[in-house]
UniProtKB/Swiss-Prot annotation:
The family this protein is said to belong to: Belongs to the tRNA pseudouridine synthase TruA family.
The entry's keywords: Isomerase, tRNA processing
PANTHER family according to UniProt: PSEUDOURIDYLATE SYNTHASE (PTHR11142), TRNA PSEUDOURIDINE SYNTHASE-LIKE 1 (PTHR11142:SF0)
Protein name: tRNA pseudouridine synthase A
Highest rank taxon of the organism: Bacteria
Active site (UniProt): 52 (nucleophile)
EC annotation from Swiss-Prot or TrEMBL: 5.4.99.12
tRNA processing listed as a keyword: yes
A Pfam family matched in the record: PseudoU_synth_1
Subunit and partners: Homodimer.
Keyword tRNA processing annotated: yes
High-level lineage: Bacteria, Pseudomonadati, Pseudomonadota, Alphaproteobacteria, Rickettsiales
HAMAP family assigned: TruA (MF_00171)
Gene from which this protein is expressed: truA
């Protein structure tokens, strides 16, 4: 068997997320069906992260096995040909060792969350960034973010449906960068809880609106209660950027 590692970009707007689900179209299903059409083999695609419906990806990584050798550039061309009705593109492919696993071999995952912060919405960024009309205090958000860095119990920021065995995660990066009309939040960790990034963003926005003081984020973290945190930020502002191995 030959194991292939692919890197994928997709627009999540009209997709039901990464994972295959009955009755809806997912990224996993689109790619598995595309692979079958050119290889004749039923494969299971393993992704490095299970993005929710509406979440986008710039560098999602996945792997699959085929019984025959195919040149990586031909795999890219073939997948993109059969996946072309959808906003899903493979932009890199390589043969890897058979012990490589897109999910379990990962050492770090990186996300970006985009906020358009101006009085009027952006047509160009519709369903690609969260529009917030009121000015956000980025300095206060940065101060609050510092409380979340490092190893913590992130129960307050996990979805009620989260299936992770432990709420303990290590946030290695949480940078907030302000442009003229856009705020980007950069988050990195070896792994994340379900909705963790979006719940962190939603809470930091409350700080940015001066509804919460920056120090309140520490209280939210220590509460270990989802009800203590802010709203879940919209899925469409989130981008899965990169996985490191």
């Amino acid at each position: 068997m030959y194991r292939y590692k692919i890197t994928i970009e997709y627009l999540g707007t009209n997709l039901a997320g990464w994972q295959r689900q009955a009755g809806v179209m997912s990224v996993q299903q689109i790619l598995e069906e595309a692979i079958y059409k050119f290889s004749g083999e039923q494969v299971i695609l393993f992704g490095s992260g299970r993005t929710d419906a509406g979440v986008h990806a710039i560098g999602q990584v996945a792997h699959f096995d085929l019984s025959k050798y195919l040149e990586p550039h031909k795999i890219i061309t073939a997948i993109n040909y059969f996946a072309r009705p959808y906003a899903v593109v493979v932009w890199h492919c390589a043969i890897v060792l058979n012990d490589f696993h897109a999910r379990f071999s990962a050492t770090s995952r990186h996300y970006i969350y985009r906020i358009i912060n101006r009085p009027y919405p952006s047509v160009i960024d519709l369903n690609r960034a969260w529009w917030i009309s009121s000015p956000l205090d980025v300095l206060a958000m940065q101060k609050a973010a510092a409380y979340l860095l490092g190893k913590h119990d992130f129960t307050s920021f996990r979805a009620s449906s989260c299936q992770s065995k432990s709420p303990i995660k290590t946030l290695t990066e949480l940078n907030i960068v302000k442009g003229d009309e856009e705020i980007k939040l950069y988050l990195s960790a070896p792994s994340f809880l379900h909705h963790m990034v979006r719940n962190i963003v939603g809470s930091l926005v409350l700080v940015g609106k001066n509804i919460w003081q920056a120090e309140h984020i520490k209280d939210v973290l220590e509460a270990k209660d989802r009800k203590a945190a802010g709203l879940t930020a919209p899925a469409y502002g989130l981008y899965f950027v990169k996985t490191e191995y």
